[in-house]
């Protein structure tokens, strides 16, 4: 059985191998502090300045163009300690924390976090130590949380578990066995109740609520499939296939009120991710645009592609930087 240290070494190798340095003027790298890595997901507050991202060792960083990265919050009291730095902090994710999915409640300013090993958390607008909401449902531990989004119409939080059988340190085992124990959950802040909405998902890595709150999309990384779960309307409470056209989808992010979504995608050959790309789909699951990103990230596992004010913010699981790609106005390359 793959040891945790071996898994970490492999993931670091995958993130750094085949690195290609792009001279594209529209692309910018923002290296995270050297003691941390893997800006996996992004969130943007109501000020519209900078962004927030979760990194290894259990920290949430805030980036402002004038100051760069600053500490905004931490998942545990240990997250600020030196032994949560570097590869040790990655190895001690069960103590330090590892934010995987983050999203703001746009009305309250609260930042919700799906921490991979430590459960669902919330952070006040002031930042600081996160408050744990829960690490289980119906008495069963989550094991491995991943994606998260907040319904912009109701404030209800939707989040996923990549697996209900394997923990983050066993991710390669889960992939090798094609584990299908992932779940989609709903957390209602008004009742403080967590509900299981979907089960039997294959590597449910990301989720995104539509701008009108009528449905939530759930990616199945292992199956190269995205499901749609209906929140409202005549199909409420049911699910269906949304698209099979995106290879190994990770996080999904809605694009404002356009009805479209960005999906982080790779081609997963055995355990080696290749050909990372950003894929835009519409509300019918049709692919509108594909942006190849191998020249900017090499063969690495993209975790998120998030559009904000004309830029794509691109994250990775273990990489040393956040990528920002300026979109060309009116461009929509055929794929």
From Swiss-Prot:
UniProt keywords, alphabetically: Alkaloid metabolism, Glycoprotein, Hydrolase, Signal, Vacuole
Residues annotated as signal peptide: 1-22
Pathways per UniProt: Alkaloid biosynthesis; 3alpha(S)-strictosidine biosynthesis; 3alpha(S)-strictosidine from secologanin and tryptamine: step 1/1
GO biological process: alkaloid metabolic process; cellular response to potassium ion starvation; response to jasmonic acid; response to wounding
Function (record text): Catalyzes the stereospecific condensation of tryptamine with secologanin to form strictosidine, the key intermediate of indole alkaloid biosynthesis.
Catalytic activity: 3alpha(S)-strictosidine + H2O = secologanin + tryptamine
Assigned GO CC terms: Golgi apparatus; mitochondrion; plant-type vacuole; plasma membrane; plasmodesma
Organism listed in the record: Arabidopsis thaliana (Mouse-ear cress)
Induction: Upon potassium (K) starvation.
Family, per entry: Belongs to the strictosidine synthase family.
Pfam families linked: SSL_N, Str_synth
InterPro entries: 6-blade_b-propeller_TolB-like (IPR011042), Strictosidine_synth_cons-reg (IPR018119)
Name assigned to this protein: Protein STRICTOSIDINE SYNTHASE-LIKE 12
Keyword Hydrolase recorded: yes
UniProt-listed Enzyme Commission number(s): 3.5.99.13
Glycosylation sites: 80
């Amino acid at each position: 059985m793959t040891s945790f240290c071996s898994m970490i070494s492999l993931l670091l190798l995958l993130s750094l191998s085949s690195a290609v340095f792009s001279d594209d003027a529209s692309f910018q790298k923002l290296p995270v502090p050297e003691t941390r890595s893997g800006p996996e997901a992004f969130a943007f507050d109501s000020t519209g300045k900078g962004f927030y991202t979760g990194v290894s060792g259990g920290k949430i960083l805030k980036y402002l163009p004038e100051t760069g990265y600053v500490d905004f919050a931490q998942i545990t009291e240990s997250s600020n300690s030196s032994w949560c730095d570097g590869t040790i902090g990655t190895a001690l994710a069960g103590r330090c924390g590892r934010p995987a999915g983050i999203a703001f409640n746009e009305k309250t300013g609260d930042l919700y976090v799906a921490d991979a090993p430590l459960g669902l958390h919330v952070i006040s607008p002031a930042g600081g130590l996160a408050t744990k909401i829960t690490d289980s449902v119906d008495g069963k531990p989550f094991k491995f949380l991943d994606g998260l989004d907040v319904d912009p119409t109701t404030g209800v939080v939707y989040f996923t578990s990549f697996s209900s059988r394997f923990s983050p340190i066993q991710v390669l085992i889960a992939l090798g066995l094609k584990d299908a124990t992932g779940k989609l959950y709903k957390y209602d802040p008004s009742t403080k109740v967590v509900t299981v909405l979907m089960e039997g998902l294959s590597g449910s890595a990301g989720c995104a609520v539509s701008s009108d709150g009528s449905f939530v999309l759930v990616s199945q990384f292992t199956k190269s499939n995205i499901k749609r779960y209906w929140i409202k309307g005549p199909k409420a409470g049911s699910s269906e296939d949304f698209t099979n056209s995106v290879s190994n989808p990770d996080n999904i992010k809605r694009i404002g009120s356009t009805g479209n979504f960005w999906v982080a995608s790779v081609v997963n050959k055995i355990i080696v991710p290749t050909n990372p790309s950003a894929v835009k789909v519409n509300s019918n699951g049709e692919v509108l645009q594909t942006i190849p990103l191998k020249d900017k990230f090499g063969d690495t596992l993209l975790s998120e592609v998030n559009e904000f004010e004309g830029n794509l913010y691109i994250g990775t699981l273990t990489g040393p930087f956040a990528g920002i790609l300026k979109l060309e106005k009116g461009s929509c390359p055929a794929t």
